[in-house]
């Protein structure tokens, strides 16, 4: 795998790169090979090479709704953070995979385009948002997604239309088929800028009041179980404030687990498992993780 630096001298590549620098939890082991393409063509080259040489490939977006285990990740990590262009085409916005969702919502505001207000505080990338059909406060990415350009795991380029992008709660065709998002097209509506700003301000205030933004975290840990709210179940189980190592069930919102200092990915995973077990025993409800967990144990 170290041959990648020789094979692709024009692409930024690091070896044994600590991944804790790239996750919102500030945890995670090292990547064997960490690749940062600057263009779609470079991305396609690396994906095709990994497929041809049977090298394990993992895509890393903004690292926000993600836990990387303490043993790190074998093979190649493809970090698409440098693909950040956002453009307007009439009432549509085209954003590349590495663009931040927050920046895309701000771009829409600046262009007086409405539809992405719900995303103004979601700390993910466009690629990650499409992968899990990210949403908040009654809105989801699939509501405004018109099309997406993706790579298959073999390096084949595909343009998917809205009808092909099946989406459900925290699920998408992109995740199901393990596609690599390159860009996304959103269909928005013209609106007065002050009205868009007012909606964003309202959602930002709600987010700041309810979420533990003062600590590193992986965002909402659990999916909403049918007929329940995960945070309420955790709170009613007496787990709010529970600590394992440096990981704590947030005192501000029980649906979040925060790093109060020196947490490891193992602390997070042990606390997640303890919460799931306790809620199962008390309420006979299975809490399914929304956060993605990848990598190897140490």
Curated annotation (Swiss-Prot):
Keyword field: Cell cycle, Cell division, Cell shape, Cell wall biogenesis/degradation, Cytoplasm, FAD, Flavoprotein, NADP, Oxidoreductase, Peptidoglycan synthesis
| Catalytic activity, EC | 1.3.1.98
Necessary cofactors:
FAD
Quick one: where is this thing mainly located? cytoplasm
Query: Where does it sit, as one GO cellular component term?
Result: cytosol
Active site: which residues?
Answer: 170, 220 (proton donor), 290
**Gene Ontology terms, MF aspect:** FAD binding; UDP-N-acetylmuramate dehydrogenase activity
Against InterPro entries, the record matches this protein to:
FAD-bd_PCMH (IPR016166), FAD-bd_PCMH-like_sf (IPR036318), FAD-bd_PCMH_sub1 (IPR016167), FAD-bd_PCMH_sub2 (IPR016169), MurB (IPR003170), MurB_C (IPR011601), MurB_C_sf (IPR036635), Oxid_FAD_bind_N (IPR006094)
General function of this protein: Cell wall formation.
What is the official name of this protein in its record? UDP-N-acetylenolpyruvoylglucosamine reductase
Q: What organism, scientifically named, is this protein from?
A: Listeria monocytogenes serotype 4b (strain CLIP80459)
Q: Upper lineage ranks? A: Bacteria, Bacillati, Bacillota, Bacilli, Bacillales
Gene assigned in the entry: murB
């Amino acid at each position: 795998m170290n041959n990648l630096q020789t094979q692709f001298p024009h692409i930024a590549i690091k070896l044994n790169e600590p991944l804790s620098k790239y996750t919102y939890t500030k945890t995670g082991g090292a990547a064997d090979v960490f690749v940062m393409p600057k263009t779609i063509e470079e991305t396609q080259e690396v994906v095709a090479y990994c497929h041809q040489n049977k090298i394990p490939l993992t895509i890393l977006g903004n690292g926000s709704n993600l836990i990387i285990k303490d043993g790190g990740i074998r093979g190649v990590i493809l970090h698409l953070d440098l693909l950040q262009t956002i453009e307007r085409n009439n009432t549509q916005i085209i954003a590349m995979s590495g663009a931040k969702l927050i920046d895309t919502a701000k771009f829409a505001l600046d262009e007086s385009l409405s539809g992405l207000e719900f995303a103004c505080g979601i700390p993910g990338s466009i690629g990650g948002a499409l992968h899990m059909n990210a949403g908040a406060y009654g809105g989801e990415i699939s509501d405004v997604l018109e099309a997406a350009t993706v790579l298959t795991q073999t390096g084949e380029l595909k343009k998917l239309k809205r009808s092909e992008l099946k989406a459900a709660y925290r699920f998408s065709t992109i995740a199901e088929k393990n596609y690599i998002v390159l860009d996304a097209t959103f269909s928005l509506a013209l609106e007065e800028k002050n009205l868009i700003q007012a909606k964003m301000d309202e959602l930002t205030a709600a987010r700041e009041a309810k979420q533990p933004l003062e600590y590193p975290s992986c965002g909402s840990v659990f999916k909403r179980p049918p007929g329940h709210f995960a945070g309420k179940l955790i709170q009613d189980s007496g787990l709010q404030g529970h600590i394992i190592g440096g990981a704590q069930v947030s005192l501000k919102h029980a649906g979040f687990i925060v790093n109060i200092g020196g947490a490891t990915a193992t602390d997070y995973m042990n606390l997640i498992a303890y919460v799931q077990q306790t809620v199962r025993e008390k309420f006979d409800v299975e809490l399914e993780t929304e956060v993605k967990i990848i990598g190897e144990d140490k």
